[in-house]
Amino acid sequence: MTRGHKFTGRIVIVGAGPGDADLLTARASAALISADTVLHDADVSTAVVQRLTEARPDLELHPAVGDPAEVAKTAVTAAKAGRTVARLVAGDPFTNDAVVKEILAIARTVVPYDVIPGVAISTAVPAYAGVPLGSTHTAADLRSGISVAALVASPMPLVLQANGEIVADTARDLVEAGLPGSTHACVTVDGSLSSQFSLVGSLDEFAAGAWPSTRTGSVVITVGAEVDKRSRLSWWESRPLFGWRVLVPRTREQAGDMSERLRSYGAVPVEVPTIAVEPPRTPAQMDRAIRGLVTGRYGWIVFTSVNAVRAVREKFAELGLDARAFAGVKVACVGEMTAEAVRDFGITPELLPSGDQSSLGLLEDFPPYDDVLDPIDRVLLPRADIATETLTAGLQERGWEVDDVTAYRTVRAAPPPAAIREAIKGGGFDAVCFTSSSTVRNLVGIAGKPNSRTVVACIGPQTAATATEFGLRVDVRPETAGVLQLVDALAEHALA
């Protein structure tokens, strides 16, 4: 909407959807990322807020405080000061009575505003619970003060937003208003999140206290015969790792793909950094190696990790170089993620292991040095300071000279909070995913050994061997070493 006044600021009312950050619309995401200030409701999910802070660490996020008039005034004042204000609300803005009042208040001013619809809680949560609403249903928010008795004569099923504390009272009121006590209802908390919990029962059972008193907060109560179809349509909660708490001992930057894959299987990933990546203590060795690339010293460069690729890119930027420095140099990688990082650099790797994505797997495919076919007999191997000698020794056995260069250091991270340490040792995690020997050593060092009930998944043979050395039982190992393959193997294990 536009008005005949000139403002550099504006207000965008954005629907956040039911909770899952992936349900933000493309337009909503763009508006939030480009905003100067975000005013958000308390019931906007932590997942959505976290997605924002990761995308825009400098974004100002403030809770919306006060009644609709006060919240509208806060937004209008900021917009008149030239700021773009995103008013972030759970679900869809026009299905929230209080937010509608805010928008009406904003509309009475000269400040330009837009409304970006969100996925409505009243339709999304039943869908995530496996309850089909069909073409006709009745939705109401009991927190707005609507009479339960007035809803009984409305088209079924009923979809009621409420607080968990009043589930029993609501069921009792529905029966007293005329619905049979045998009518089925599904109560869902944390709808669309990996922590979603649903319980099906009759109104009589809920009236008698079937809903757990520990499950507080916002819930969606779906009432009617359609609830009976949940046993066949519960797609979200039937995923193989649904509800599993999985420990991911990696930095947040490295854990992104793994955590996303875990969520796709229904797990709740908990990222606990065990290592920090730092530059080498003396950069001279790395400087000489990079200059050697430019002068034609190397026939091959071998990358064994994303961190190694990142270290070389940073050194290139420091020295004013780009991908052209790789001219005439063949590139080998261990792991698809490492290869993808190289491709992002503008280079296509010549060699990846055809089998096991490990140093041993690469050695099986790496060609021996041939003084006729290979004009240069030297390989550059940029890697961590604590890497094993397996790859270097194997390349030398194949006739290559190897410059084994420390590209980065891995140092042990600070211990996690006490609650996390206790959960690790006490069985508070269903599984742990180890992606390197250093993550095993460092996790045990800073937090202790995982409980014997915890499923231990290791990315490859060397990592598994280290875990065994520390007295851990290795339950899962993918056929092909890789972060995503590791998660897939864990999901298969859960189904076995």
Predicted regions mapped to residue ranges:
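Conserved beta-alpha
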Residues: 45-46, 68, 115-126, 139-153, ...
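Class I S-adenosyl-L-methionine
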Residues: 1-116, 212, 219, 296-308, ...
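Structural motif
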Residues: 10-12, 36-37, 59-62, 83-87, ...
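A short acidic, amphipathic alpha-helical/loop segment
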Residues: 27-28, 51, 74, 102, ...
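Short glycine/serine/threonine-rich phosphate/pyrophosphate-binding segments
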Residues: 21-24, 94-100, 119-125, 166-170, ...
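Active-site/ligand-binding-proximal alpha/beta "capping" segment
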Residues: 93-109, 148-154, 167-170, 418-426
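Short Gly/Thr/Asp-enriched flexible loops that form oxyanion-binding sites at enzyme active sites
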Residues: 94-113, 127-130, 313-317, 444-447
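Charge-patterned, long linear interaction tracts outside catalytic cores
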Residues: 159-160, 164-175, 181-183
